[in-house]
């Protein structure tokens, strides 16, 4: 399915009852082919979706609510278009379910089917909201650099690394990531964390490269995969992990993570802007 056929940018009709058919899958293959990715992925990882506007009725008609988190594996053949995800979650509002577990099971079944892979689902009930974390991405901030730039389309030539020096291990972060929805043109604001082991990456060039996404159109997942591949090819790190946390839209935030080495899942802690 093409993004142009999704609910994005079209008049919205809210479903009166639960409707799994609202989910609109988009194949990852098209964007990956443009990046030169063949069948064998050069990374693995997860897309972490947080949903803050999930509510349903219990068996007696009383509204219930939860914050939902979906863990979509990067190897899944599809992503779900975000507005369709919002409409799908909204369709639960006037539908009755016997328990929280029943809601979780339905969410897992439907989203897994749309993505074409097993998706993990967690629901946090109101009595546990106090346990939800908020913290900034850990690492050395690139935004401290005072520099000039005029490149606002992705340009990997901005990237360089000191290949003739000893390898280093660094974690670098920036809050200056911005890209744009390929269907509506709406800006997507995010923060990005880059951890690597290898030749030291030029910090100013990396920040200019991150800023260069400012006028780029692409879904969150596609932007992170492009960042990962450009750094991998231009700087040749031995190990690389890229994690972005995008601000919320329509009650959803999307947080893609890509890596080429075994490590634990990054913390799903909201940043201040989320």
Curated annotation (Swiss-Prot):
This protein's UniProt keywords: Cytoplasm, NADP, Oxidoreductase, Queuosine biosynthesis
Positions with a binding annotation for substrate: 80-82, 220-221
Record Gene3D superfamilies: 3.30.1130.10
Chemical reaction(s) catalysed: 7-aminomethyl-7-carbaguanine + 2 NADP(+) = 7-cyano-7-deazaguanine + 2 NADPH + 3 H(+)
Binding site for NADPH: 82-83, 249-250
Listed EC numbers: 1.7.1.13
GO cellular component, one term: cytoplasm
One Pfam family recorded for the sequence: QueF
Superkingdom per UniProt: Bacteria
Enzyme type, top EC level: oxidoreductase
Active-site annotation: 181 (thioimide intermediate), 188 (proton donor)
GO annotation terms (biological process): queuosine biosynthetic process; tRNA modification
Gene Ontology terms for molecular function: preQ1 synthase activity
Pathway involvement of the protein, from the record: tRNA modification; tRNA-queuosine biosynthesis
Subcellular localization(s) per the UniProt record: Cytoplasm
InterPro entries: GTP-CH-I_C/QueF, NADPH_dep_7-cyano-7-deazaG_red, QueF, QueF_N, QueF_type2
Family: Belongs to the GTP cyclohydrolase I family. QueF type 2 subfamily.
Record note on quaternary structure: Homodimer.
Record function comment: Catalyzes the NADPH-dependent reduction of 7-cyano-7-deazaguanine (preQ0) to 7-aminomethyl-7-deazaguanine (preQ1).
Name of the protein in question: NADPH-dependent 7-cyano-7-deazaguanine reductase
């Amino acid at each position: 399915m093409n993004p142009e056929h999704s609910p994005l940018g079209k008049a919205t009709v809210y479903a009166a009852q639960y409707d799994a058919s609202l989910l609109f899958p988009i194949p990852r293959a098209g964007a990956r082919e443009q990046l030169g990715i063949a069948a064998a992925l050069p990374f693995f990882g997860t897309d972490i979706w947080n949903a803050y506007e999930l509510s349903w009725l219990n068996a007696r008609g009383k509204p219930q609510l939860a914050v939902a988190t979906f863990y979509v594996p990067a190897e899944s053949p599809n992503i779900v278009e975000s507005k369709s995800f919002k409409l799908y979650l909204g369709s639960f509002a006037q539908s009755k379910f016997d328990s929280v577990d029943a809601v979780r099971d339905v969410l897992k079944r439907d989203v897994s089917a749309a993505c074409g892979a097993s998706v993990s689902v967690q629901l946090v009930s109101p009595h546990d909201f106090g346990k939800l974390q908020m913290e900034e991405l850990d690492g050395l901030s690139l935004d401290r650099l005072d520099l000039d730039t005029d490149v606002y389309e992705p340009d990997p030539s901005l990237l360089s690394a000191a290949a003739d020096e000893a390898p280093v291990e660094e974690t670098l972060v920036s809050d200056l990531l911005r890209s744009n929805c390929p269907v509506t043109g709406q800006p997507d604001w995010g923060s990005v964390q880059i951890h690597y082991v290898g030749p030291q990456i030029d910090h100013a060039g990396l920040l200019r490269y991150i800023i260069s996404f400012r006028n780029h159109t692409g879904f969150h997942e596609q932007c992170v995969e492009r960042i990962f591949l450009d750094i991998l090819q231009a700087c040749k790190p031995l190990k690389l992990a890229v994690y972005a946390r995008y601000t919320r839209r329509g009650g959803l935030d999307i947080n893609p993570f890509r890596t080429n080495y075994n490590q634990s899942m990054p913390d799903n802690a909201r940043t201040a802007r989320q």
